[in-house]
Design a protein with these regions (language model features):
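Bacterial N-terminal signal peptides
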Residues: 1-8
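Mature N-terminal, pre-catalytic/accessory segment of carbohydrate-active enzymes
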Residues: 17-38
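Aromatic-rich peripheral "rim/lid" segments of glycoside hydrolase catalytic domains that contact
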Residues: 21, 322-382
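Active-site region of glycoside hydrolase catalytic domains
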Residues: 23, 35, 145-288, 295, ...
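Aromatic- and carboxylate-lined catalytic core of secreted/periplasmic carbohydrate-active enzymes
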Residues: 27, 282-285, 303, 374-382
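Active-site mouth of glycoside hydrolases
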Residues: 27-29, 40-201, 206-215, 225, ...
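Structural motif corresponding to alpha-helix initiation and N-cap regions
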Residues: 30, 66-70, 295-298, 330-333
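Hydrophobic beta-strand scaffold residues
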Residues: 124-126, 312, 347
């Protein structure tokens, strides 16, 4: 069933946590959040809209006007999602010679997409979601300055939209390896966004892949209109089995079960010929991943948020469906959603359509995966 929206959903959880490293800088603070409760309530259960304005080799007019349609947005609402996270590749908007000057034609396509989403009563996170190549440029101070100018201009453009329904996410998984450096970079970007959009809520994350370890390294910024965020794809051996882009081990895996145990893994380990991948899979079995383990992991993130009295979301989690046992994938999604809601953490699943999808899409028509929708605690409206 659909759980009623209440402002207490994001209430702090009283849980102890070890002290993180400190940074002596005025831009950091431990003051309570000033994010309006109504905004938090709109980010309870969402879905990622990927491969539309990001992760595509084609940003042509035909692609942008046909990849995701009004029918898709209507279905997202009917499934019971309250918001979407719109992934946005900055490169088509970005002018290296004049970063503050946005591509007007492409900006119009983005505006049309936002109009489509907001017209359905959904909230939307505009997530800057660059390629790895673009993100690696953040190792250069000059590129940081250019990106800062870009974000200020984009934020100013988006500031005309209702701040109760549109949220601005600094960047997806920045890949900056140095956590201290990322604290400074993100602080600079937050200042730029805030100067362009004084009223809008900003979403900030940790360095590298923005997981829980990176979240724990973060110190809240002095800007109190920020929601903090993390991604969760553990255990990776299960959620990314068969994914050729995700590292040297998981590409060898198929039919990896969840929950895990030495006994369940023993039934498939002989199908893996690569020695390193075999050892990694055996370790996954020994780790005994299940609902209780996921609950403990999410509890650590919740404790960090409680310590600093800041709101927290998880706007990426999911399982690659090509090789995972379908029933086990449903169990993992249910366990994740249950843990997040236990700790009053708003969520957005990865993704609407694609390898991790909540729908099956054929010939432009999408059909919800009934078991996944149920695992998310949602009910499709007629």
């Amino acid at each position: 069933m659909i759980i009623a929206v209440t402002s207490s959903f994001f209430a702090p959880v009283s849980t102890a946590i070890k002290t993180e490293p400190t940074v002596d800088a005025a831009e950091f603070s431990s003051t309570q959040s000033a994010v309006p409760a109504a905004r938090l309530a709109r980010l309870r259960h969402g879905i990622n809209l990927s491969h539309w304005f990001a992760q595509s080799a084609d940003y042509s007019r035909v692609h942008l006007e046909s990849h995701t349609t009004a029918e898709d947005i209507d279905l997202i609402r009917k499934i019971g999602f309250d918001h979407v996270r719109l992934t946005l590749e900055p490169a088509p908007l970005f002018n290296p010679q004049d970063p503050a000057k946005l591509n007007a034609e492409y900006l119009e396509y983005l505006d049309n997409a936002l109009d489509l989403i907001l017209a359905q009563g959904l909230a939307v996170i505009v997530d800057i979601h660059p390629t790895d190549e673009f993100k690696l440029r953040l190792n250069s101070n000059g590129q940081i300055e250019a990106f800062t100018k870009f974000w200020r201009a984009l934020a100013q453009h988006l500031s005309a939209r209702d701040p109760d329904h549109l949220f601005l996410e600094v960047i997806n998984e920045p890949m900056v390896q140095d956590g201290y450096r990322w604290l400074g970079i993100q602080g600079k970007l937050i200042s730029a966004i805030r100067s362009g959009a004084p009223q809008h809520t900003i979403i900030a994350s940790g360095h590298r892949w923005s997981g829980i370890p990176e979240l724990l390294f973060l110190l809240p910024y002095a800007d109190r209109n920020i929601i903090y965020n993390f991604h969760f794809y553990e255990p990776f051996a299960f959620t990314h089995q068969g994914a050729t882009w995700a590292g040297p081990n998981v590409s060898f895996y198929k039919n990896v079960p969840y929950p895990s145990s030495p006994e369940s893994i023993s039934r498939i380990v002989d199908t893996v010929q690569d020695e390193s991948a075999r050892r990694n899979l055996l370790r996954y079995g020994e780790e005994r991943w299940n609902a209780a383990r996921i609950d403990r992991e999410i509890g650590v993130a919740a404790a960090w948020a409680a310590k600093y009295q800041v709101p927290l979301t998880c706007n990426e989690f999911g399982t690659y469906r090509s090789f995972a046992p379908a029933a086990d994938r449903v169990v993992w999604i249910r366990d994740m959603r249950t843990a997040l809601e236990k700790y009053r953490i708003g969520w957005a699943m990865w993704e609407y359509a694609g390898g991790f999808a909540v729908v099956n899409k054929k010939n432009g028509h999408a059909t919800p995966d009934a078991e996944v929708v149920k695992a998310l605690g949602l009910v499709v409206k007629k």
